[in-house]
Amino acid sequence: MARSRFDTGSGPSQRQLRVGELIRRTLSSVLNQGDIHDPDLNRMSITVGEVRTSPDLKVATAYVLPLGGHGAQDALDALRRNRHELRRAVSKELTLKFSPELRFQIDETFDRMDETRRLLSQDHVRQDLDKPDED
């Protein structure tokens, strides 16, 4: 298969990013409206932070976190239990050749940002950052 001259080979393609964002919006909408027939899932307020798709768009991994960050494992279990119904809801909204298999992961972005802030606020790191450039 020939590669596009615009493809650098690193990172997701524009199509992957676009489809991932469409799936993210659709999942968020379905979860907010409570269209899923699971009372446990409908009681939770879940944030869909990002959706990454495989290059062939057949697998979509949604990074989710319940509001407040509490009960993350319960939310993940409920989403995994209802993944087939969520997949049907996504495929009803989007016009894709294949309905992607949905996988769910806990979104750790906020934890990583907090850790980065903590590291950057340490005294020995701060003094290195505050040094004037010698160029």
Swiss-Prot record:
InterPro entries, alphabetized: KH_dom-like_a/b (IPR015946), RbfA (IPR000238), RbfA_dom_sf (IPR023799), Ribosome-bd_factorA_CS (IPR020053)
Q: Where found in the cell?
A: Cytoplasm
Which Gene Ontology cellular-component terms appear in the entry?
cytosol
Superkingdom of origin organism: Bacteria
GO biological process assignments = maturation of SSU-rRNA
List the keywords (alphabetical): Cytoplasm, Ribosome biogenesis
GO MF terms listed in the record are: ribosomal small subunit binding
Q: How does it assemble?
A: Monomer. Binds 30S ribosomal subunits, but not 50S ribosomal subunits or 70S ribosomes.
- Family named by the database record: Belongs to the RbfA family.
What exactly does this protein do? Answer: One of several proteins that assist in the late maturation steps of the functional core of the 30S ribosomal subunit. Associates with free 30S ribosomal subunits (but not with 30S subunits that are part of 70S ribosomes or polysomes). Required for efficient processing of 16S rRNA. May interact with the 5'-terminal helix region of 16S rRNA.
This chain's protein is named Ribosome-binding factor A
Give the organism the record lists.
Dinoroseobacter shibae (strain DSM 16493 / NCIMB 14021 / DFL 12)
